[in-house]
């Protein structure tokens, strides 16, 4: 099997090489070995980055290491001294630019490939002109040959220069001219006497190493000329950074939220499908528009929410398209909270997977609070009813400014108790402007709202998933249990098949791994997740949330993190955490540090209340 895969990957590369276009990005065809081809190209890019880094190091060393008198004498006999000095300065710029291009090469940017090809050849010329170094020049010519042979490994698009980015360039030129003219005026007696126009020309040409810099009569004047060259080098670096910004592809925009939710409702088979349509997420259209995948891109990692959602039979094509799209944009493809079926299918593509949590799903056909396994649930419900808690749906026709204000008050207090802003990604937020996309239930005491929940549909309207779960700090014990139970009973009476209470990260890590399910998973990663589950209560109360949802006697469905075999798991874990944070990342982290150790008043029995902290998958 491995030989057939390798042969398929080689055939794919050979077909790509035979394409006539030379500098245009090569399209990666949709195929079963899409991930295999991506991994092969990634390994080749790593070798390219190593080779480029060696040349960049040689460039910097060749530019800054002092030359001996004998070396200078040889240079003076063969080259004008000004040309030699200019070559050394350009060599430094070339080395710095190559280092800047290294990250773009690793991501597969075509622009980075073109730039590296040019700069390595230029480095060879500059090593000859600046230092007459035949060894370094020969070394610099090796990477461009290798880059040319693996040109099909660079298919990613960098973001086109925007108007805002282009406007930065005149500011740099203007600042350079202003700085140069003011400095020349201050040092007029120590610099050559030139006209105003000649000064402008000399400043620009000197800054970008297009001519020999004018000499100065004093050390201060010579330092001023060197500062112009540093300014020019910095400008080139900024321009290179602007050219290599990653693409941010929003193929489905926030304005499409309503249509996106309806599509995910129709074709979604798991609760995560509904969360993929939350307004802050972007979406990729895969399999010729037949499949939708909600995602967020953070630092070059595209994190898909759950499974790709679409018509049956499109799973293979959708996964191949996801890999291809990510490679074209320089992203690492990842699926967060994918189902067991998707994880199995992805492993056949060459992905790795590890169980990271479980989803609590309640079968509604025979749901009731009767029986021993839901005895604790009955007790909490009776207690809440004795305290006067009344539960009802809150529909668009019933909306009032008073109730809306009370919902906002509860949500604001909940945020204050957890010392942070609203999170996002797979966590919903209270947005009354999109009220009709949710089904909302409220709990009242004496006509005042003390808690509420929101639900999102999936399975073509035959199932719902719990999104927001928020309560007032003085809500009676058992309020949340009663609120959820009455919602579930209503869903059952309306003929719905199931209701997801959402996922619990880390909930499965203390259970044995099913035979063959995660043969490739890193045991050290599972050990780390298990430790976090056992000791991470200060950060995320997974155990409390698991105990709370267990009272509903759900069935537990595993959720997986699916990632390429060669991916950096530490980087993926970091980007997943950042995906949940809004723009105020610093404020969120500061809030976690300042979190009050005293928990809010319980809404249930002290040993089984839902945690007050938000969690990936459920805002409780």
Stretch-by-stretch model annotation:
Residues 2-253, 616:
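Topology signature of small-to-medium multi-pass alpha-helical membrane proteins
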Residues 112-113, 134-135, 333, 349-358:
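Short, flexible active-site-proximal loops enriched in glycine and acidic residues
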Residues 530-534:
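Short beta-alpha connecting loops at secondary-structure transitions
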């Amino acid at each position: 099997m491995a030989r057939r895969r390798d042969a398929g990957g080689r055939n794919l590369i050979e077909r790509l090489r035979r394409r006539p276009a030379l500098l245009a990005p090569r399209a990666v065809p949709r195929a079963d070995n899409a991930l295999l081809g991506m991994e092969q190209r990634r390994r080749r890019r790593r070798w390219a980055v190593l080779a480029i880094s060696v040349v960049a190091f040689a460039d910097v060393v060749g530019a800054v290491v002092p030359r001996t008198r004998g070396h200078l004498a040889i240079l003076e006999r063969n080259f004008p001294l000004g040309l030699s000095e200019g070559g050394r300065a350009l060599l430094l710029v070339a080395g710095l630019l190559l280092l800047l291009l290294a990250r773009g090469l690793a991501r597969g940017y075509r622009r980075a490939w073109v730039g590296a090809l040019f700069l390595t050849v230029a480095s060879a010329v500059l090593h000859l002109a600046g230092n007459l170094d035949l060894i370094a020049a020969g070394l610099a010519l090796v990477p461009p040959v290798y880059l040319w042979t693996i040109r099909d490994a660079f298919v990613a698009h960098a973001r086109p220069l925007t108007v805002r980015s282009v406007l930065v360039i005149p500011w740099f030129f203007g600042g350079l001219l202003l700085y140069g003219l003011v400095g020349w005026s201050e040092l007029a007696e120590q610099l050559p006497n030139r006209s105003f126009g000649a000064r402008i020309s000399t400043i620009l040409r000197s800054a970008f190493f297009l001519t020999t810099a004018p000499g100065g009569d004093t050390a201060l004047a010579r330092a001023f000329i060197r500062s112009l060259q540093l300014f020019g080098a910095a400008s080139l670096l900024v321009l290179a950074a602007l050219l290599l910004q990653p693409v941010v592809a929003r193929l489905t925009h926030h304005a499409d939220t309503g249509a996106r939710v309806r599509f995910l409702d129709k074709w979604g088979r798991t609760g995560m499908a509904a969360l993929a349509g939350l307004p802050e997420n972007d979406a990729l259209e895969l399999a010729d528009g037949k499949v939708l995948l909600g995602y967020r891109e953070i630092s070059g990692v595209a994190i898909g929410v759950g499974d790709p959602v679409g018509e049956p039979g499109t799973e293979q094509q959708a996964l191949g398209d996801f890999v291809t799209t990510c490679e074209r944009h320089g992203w690492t493809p990842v699926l967060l909270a994918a189902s067991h079926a998707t994880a199995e299918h992805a492993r056949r593509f060459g992905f790795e997977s590890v169980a990271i949590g479980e989803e609590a799903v309640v079968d509604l056909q025979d749901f009731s609070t009767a029986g021993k396994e839901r005895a604790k649930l009955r007790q909490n419900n009776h207690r809440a009813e004795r305290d006067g808690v009344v539960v009802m749906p809150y529909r668009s026709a019933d909306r009032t400014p008073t109730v809306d204000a009370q919902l906002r008050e509860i949500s604001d207090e909940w945020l204050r108790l957890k010392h942070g802003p609203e999170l996002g990604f797979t966590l919903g937020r209270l947005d009354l402007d999109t009220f009709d996309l949710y089904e909302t239930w409220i709990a009242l005491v004496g006509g005042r709202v003390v808690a509420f929940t929101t639900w999102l549909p999936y399975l073509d309207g035959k199932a719902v998933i719990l999104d927001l779960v928020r309560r007032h700090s003085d809500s009676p014990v058992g309020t949340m249990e009663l609120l959820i139970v009455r919602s579930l009973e209503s869903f059952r009476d309306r003929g719905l098949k199931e209701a997801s209470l959402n996922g619990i990260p880390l909930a499965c890590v203390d259970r044995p791994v099913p035979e063959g399910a995660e043969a490739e998973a890193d045991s050290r990663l599972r050990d780390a997740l298990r430790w976090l589950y056992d000791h991470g209560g200060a950060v995320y109360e997974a155990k409390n949330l698991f105990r709370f949802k267990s009272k509903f006697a759900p069935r537990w469905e595993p959720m997986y993190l699916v990632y390429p075999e060669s991916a950096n798991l530490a980087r993926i874990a970091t980007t997943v955490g950042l995906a949940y944070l809004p723009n105020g990342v610093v404020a969120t982290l500061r809030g976690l540090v300042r979190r009050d150790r005293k928990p809010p008043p319980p809404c249930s029995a002290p040993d089984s209340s839902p945690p007050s902290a938000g969690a990936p998958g459920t805002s409780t």
